[in-house]
């Protein structure tokens, strides 16, 4: 027990002595700088301190007491920690405990102290340094891209202005430092734009913008921060160009397409006038359709002059002095022609061409009433003293140089000279009639008609009447026996010169020059002949209201409208239409001009409205294909050719016209894509192929009654017959079916060939050439044999294909069973009985119908009167008469019923076919002997 007490006492004494010794060893506190400045890069952990973190202790090199064991940080949760790198040297380092984000905190300030290791290994009696202030700045990293504050920018500018700033775009950056958070530059990404942008984001235009050129711009803009980091996404900027309020028409199309056959089409359905809110008292708009380059001034029918006069109801008897060159009209062959694509025949005279009209063409009986008409296009005459330019001249052929009548142009005046042979030679009479008109030298087409009712002469130009401004008198011409010469394009000087020649040449273009003796043209006919088939129109006149006034010029190429308010004129302009009534119009452009005058209150004109230039495009029409079809070969007995009525050549002829359509809706036509079209024809020619007709023994004829009720006429020659006039294909079919060929001396004739062709629009569209061949049978036996083989009870038959007769093999006949032979014989006998009964029935029926015809009616188509025949020598006339055969049947009663049905059907045919059929039946019954009672003449 005593030992334990002694031991404890010793330990206590020793520990006390050690404490006294330690206090004597760790005498000094560590020493550090009073302040530190550090920098740490964002997202890094090491802090760069200035000065470096070093603690000193004067107790060194005493172990523990002179060593540094720790650095401690005091602050509000400073995200840093200090670490001793070397206890002896006192070096330390400052690190971040986690990622440092500059965007959250840019600077940190805290307190740091150094601690030595104390006096012993257990750290007892340690000492700490004074407090030092540490200030740390966070260095930014350019980790964010600029971002625009708006997803889209919009602005509106007025055209024609230069802006310093149209709008400003703005971007920002999330980086914390001024270097990386500021936007230093903007850039327009879109290339070739009339815009620029400065470093502050202001967008301006670099040139004057035009609403007509471009109404909207879309550009893309990007931004750069001061570290040259580019925005991840560019921003769109939309800039609208607002037009300067310009007075004028708006909402119209420069081109309007016109489909042929669509009638009236509105030209400006959405058109309206902008006046910029200016007060107005009246508006006047003039719409002009320019068609001077189309045909003869506008789209007109291009039929021949004869066909047009027939169509317009002009009096017959006019002479065409400028017909198309042909074998019979060869005096125009040497003239220059300018036929357009519409087959519109135009003759050009350049001051060196003229034509002598043959004497047989010249009208010889000009009375006190006659008409001269022509289309003329003429410009100013060259030279200071222009000479006379003669269109038409009738002068002495030889010896003298007297002008009996002439039509000429002199110094843009139209002069008509008429000197008559009078009994009273001592009296002055009106001789020269002068008109001074702008139309004569305006280089445009005009239609001139001179109506002579001597001593009065009236001029019509495009349907408008003009009286002469000057009429001069002259002595009458002394009667003489000197022949006269009618010329076109110049005047013939046959006397008073060494060599007869042309003088006073015409320079211009002529078409349709005609002269009609004995009658003058009426206003209605003149208007019809020169009428335009295209023009301006107003749709829905009733919708215009009372606030609009309008009027057309005679050709409907100019429309003038006036209104007191804007709404009325806008409504009226939407109703303006274009119309072309031709079935096959001339395709191409027609120019449109609109001039507008606006009047304000108390002023003449206050707003200037720009002129509008537009166009109508007439699309090409579907070209028709005219097809003539029928029997191409006929066989006739010579006796029929000798008959007074001859034979009808084209009895079963058919004329159709088709057009090819791409529209799928037209597949209901006869063939997919093909549509049958109804239109007029203007002539059909029947020409003789081979030798011309011999007037001594043959002729082509068409009865005048066949043309009655139609707009048709016919002319003939030894080459053929021409049926002309503007009429339907059905009327042409009817007329052609009445063309008859007659040969009263057919002894040496074995065949004749003819060719039929038709035209629409004076040859613009022509048919196929239909060839017909007729064969002549001279013996009655041959006729009976042919007819028997054809099993027909008529002399003539259409031959569609060569007749092939098959001979029955005798071995086959001998092998026929007896029962079959009996049946065949009985059938043949029954057939013979039926045929005989049928022929008798036909004959009796025809006699009854003939009596009824004589009592009740007389067919004008078959009432042949040789005095009224147009003996058109060289034109084909053939008539094909066909009978239906009764079908054979085992039952004789059924055969009788079938035969009766066929006869009833035959009786229901038209009168022409009935009478022709009856003629043939009578001939069969009489065995080639004519039964006069069956003939209709």
From Swiss-Prot:
One of its GO terms (cellular component) is dendrite. Glycans are attached at residues 86, 330, 365, 716. One of its GO terms (molecular function) is calcium ion binding. It is found in: Postsynaptic cell membrane; Endoplasmic reticulum membrane; Golgi apparatus membrane; Cell projection, Dendrite. Keywords: Calcium, Cell adhesion, Cell membrane, Cell projection, Endoplasmic reticulum, Glycoprotein, Golgi apparatus, Membrane, Postsynaptic cell membrane, Repeat, Signal, Synapse, Transmembrane, Transmembrane helix. InterPro entries: Cadherin-like_dom (IPR002126), Cadherin-like_sf (IPR015919), CLSTN_C (IPR045588), ConA-like_dom_sf (IPR013320). SMART domains: CA. It is a single-pass type I membrane protein. Residues 1-22 form the signal peptide. It holds the Pfam family Cadherin. Binds synaptic Ca(2+) with its cytoplasmic domain. This is Calsyntenin-2.
């Amino acid at each position: 027990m005593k030992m334990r007490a002694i031991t404890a006492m010793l330990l206590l004494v020793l520990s006390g002595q050690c404490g006294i010794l330690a206090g004597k060893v760790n005498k000094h506190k560590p020493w550090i700088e009073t302040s530190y400045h550090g920098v740490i890069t964002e997202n890094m952990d090491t802090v760069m301190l200035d000065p470096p973190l070093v603690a000193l202790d004067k107790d060194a090199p005493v172990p523990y007491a002179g060593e540094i064991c720790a650095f401690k940080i005091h602050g509000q949760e400073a995200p840093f920690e200090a670490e001793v790198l070397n206890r002896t040297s006192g070096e330390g380092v400052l690190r971040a405990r986690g990622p440092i984000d500059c965007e959250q905190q840019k600077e940190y300030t805290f307190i740091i102290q150094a601690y030595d290791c104390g006096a012993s290994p257990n750290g007892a009696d340690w000492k700490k340094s004074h407090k030092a202030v540490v200030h740390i700045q966070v260095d930014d990293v350019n980790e964010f891209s600029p971002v625009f504050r708006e997803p889209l920018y919009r602005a509106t500018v007025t055209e024609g202005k230069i802006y310093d700033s149209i709008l400003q775009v703005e971007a920002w950056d999330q980086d914390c430092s001024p270097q990386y958070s500021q936007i230093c530059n903007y850039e327009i990404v879109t290339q070739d734009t009339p815009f620029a942008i400065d470093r502050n984001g202001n967008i301006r235009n670099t040139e004057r913008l035009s609403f007509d050129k471009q109404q909207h711009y879309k550009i893309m803009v990007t931004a750069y921060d001061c570290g040259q980091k580019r925005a991840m996404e560019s921003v769109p900027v939309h800039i609208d160009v607002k037009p300067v309020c310009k007075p004028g028409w708006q909402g119209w199309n420069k081109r309007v397409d016109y489909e042929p056959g669509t009638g009236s089409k509105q030209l400006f359905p959405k058109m309206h006038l902008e006046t910029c809110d200016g007060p107005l008292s009246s508006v006047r708009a003039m719409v002009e359709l320019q068609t001077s380059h189309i045909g003869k001034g506008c789209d007109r029918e291009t039929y021949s002059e004869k066909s047009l006069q027939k169509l317009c109801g002009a009096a017959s008897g006019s002479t065409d002095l400028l017909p198309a060159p042909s074998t019979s009209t060869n005096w125009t062959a040497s003239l220059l022609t300018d036929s357009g694509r519409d087959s519109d025949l135009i003759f050009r005279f350049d001051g060196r061409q003229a034509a002598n009209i043959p004497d047989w063409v010249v009208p010889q009986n000009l009375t006190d009433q006659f008409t001269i008409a022509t289309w003329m296009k003429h410009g100013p005459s060259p030279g200071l003293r222009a000479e006379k330019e003669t269109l038409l001249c009738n002068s002495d052929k030889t010896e003298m140089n007297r002008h009996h009548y002439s039509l000429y142009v002199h110094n843009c005046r139209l002069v008509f000279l008429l000197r008559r042979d009078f009994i009273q030679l001592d009296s002055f009479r009106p001789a020269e009639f002068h008109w001074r008109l702008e139309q004569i030298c305006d280089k445009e087409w005009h239609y001139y008609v001179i109506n002579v009712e001597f001593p009065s002469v009236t001029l019509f130009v495009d349907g408008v009447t003009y009286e002469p401004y000057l009429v001069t008198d002259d002595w009458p011409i002394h009667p003489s026996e000197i022949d006269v010469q009618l010329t076109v394009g110049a005047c013939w000087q046959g006397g008073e010169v060494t060599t007869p020649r042309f003088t006073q040449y015409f320079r211009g273009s002529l078409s349709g020059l005609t002269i009609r003796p004995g009658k003058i043209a009426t206003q209605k006919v003149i208007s019809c002949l020169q009428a335009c088939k295209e023009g301006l129109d107003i749709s829905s006149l009733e919708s215009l209201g009372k606030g609009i006034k309008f009027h057309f010029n005679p050709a409907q190429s100019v429309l003038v409208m006036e209104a007191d308010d804007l709404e009325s004129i806008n409504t009226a302009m939407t109703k303006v239409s274009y119309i072309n009534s031709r079935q096959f119009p001339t395709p191409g452009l027609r120019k449109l001009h609109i001039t507008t005058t606006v009047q304000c209150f108390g002023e003449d004109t206050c707003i200037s409205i720009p002129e509008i230039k537009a166009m109508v495009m007439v699309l090409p029409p579907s070209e028709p294909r005219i097809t003539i079809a029928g029997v191409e070969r006929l066989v006739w007995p010579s006796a029929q050719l000798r008959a007074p009525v001859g034979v009808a050549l084209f009895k079963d002829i058919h004329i159709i016209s088709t057009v090819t359509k791409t529209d799928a809706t037209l597949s209901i036509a006869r063939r997919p894509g093909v549509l049958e079209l109804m239109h007029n024809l203007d002539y059909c020619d029947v020409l003789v192929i081979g030798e011309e007709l011999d007037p001594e023994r043959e002729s082509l004829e068409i009865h005048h009654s066949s043309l009655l009720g139609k707009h048709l006429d016919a002319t003939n020659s030894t080459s053929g017959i021409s049926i002309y006039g503007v009429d339907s294909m059905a009327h042409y079919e009817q007329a052609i079916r009445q063309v008859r060929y007659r040969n009263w001396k057919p002894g040496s004739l074995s065949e004749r060939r003819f060719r039929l062709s038709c035209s629409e629009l004076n040859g613009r569209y022509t048919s196929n050439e239909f060839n017909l061949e007729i064969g002549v049978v001279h013996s009655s036996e041959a006729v009976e044999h042919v007819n028997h083989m054809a099993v027909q009870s008529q002399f003539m038959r259409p031959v569609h294909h060569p007749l092939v007769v098959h001979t029955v093999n005798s071995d086959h006949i001998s092998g026929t069973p007896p029962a079959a032979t009996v049946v065949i014989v009985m059938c043949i006998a029954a057939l013979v009985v039926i045929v005989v009964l049928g022929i008798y029935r036909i004959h009796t029926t025809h006699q009854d119908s003939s009596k009824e015809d004589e009592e009740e009616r007389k067919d004008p188509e078959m009432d042949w009167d040789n005095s009224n025949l147009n003996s058109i020598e060289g034109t084909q006339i053939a008539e094909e008469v066909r009978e239906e055969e009764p079908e054979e049947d085992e039952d004789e009663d059924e055969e009788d019923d079938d035969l009766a049905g066929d006869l009833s059907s035959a009786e229901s045919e038209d009168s022409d076919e009935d009478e022709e059929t009856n003629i043939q039946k009578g001939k069969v019954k009489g065995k080639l002997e004519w039964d006069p009672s069956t003939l209709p003449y």
